[in-house]
Swiss-Prot record:
UniProt name for this protein: Uncharacterized protein RC0324
UniProt-annotated stretches for the region Disordered: 82-107
Alphabetized Pfam families for the sequence: DUF2610 (PF11020)
InterPro entries: DUF2610
Highest taxon, organism lineage: Bacteria
Species the sequence originates in: Rickettsia conorii (strain ATCC VR-613 / Malish 7)
Comp. bias regions, Acidic residues: 90-99
Amino acid sequence: MAHYKEFEFDCDFSGQRAKFKFYIGTPQEGHHPLQFQAKWLSDERGGTIPDDVMKAISQLNDLAKKNGVPLPDLCVYALGSAQEVQATPQDEDENESENQEDKAEQA
């Protein structure tokens, strides 16, 4: 059974950014992990995966092969950590706003 994980990336649709789901598994040798999904997205939906995402996934694939770990698991670790870091400042701002609202209600 194939081992893969689901991820969402912001993609470009004629200047509009929208999240799109992708499935990352272990690609065949010589193929980018998102090669076929990127082609489908372009051909069928007119969208493109940002170059920085393609490059990052390619680098993670190289690292996974070098260290003998499954690419999907490495992506969960690397991309999950990055998403947590991005979410943290926003979460703190939301918590701070809630705390200020609570204090205002108590006053």
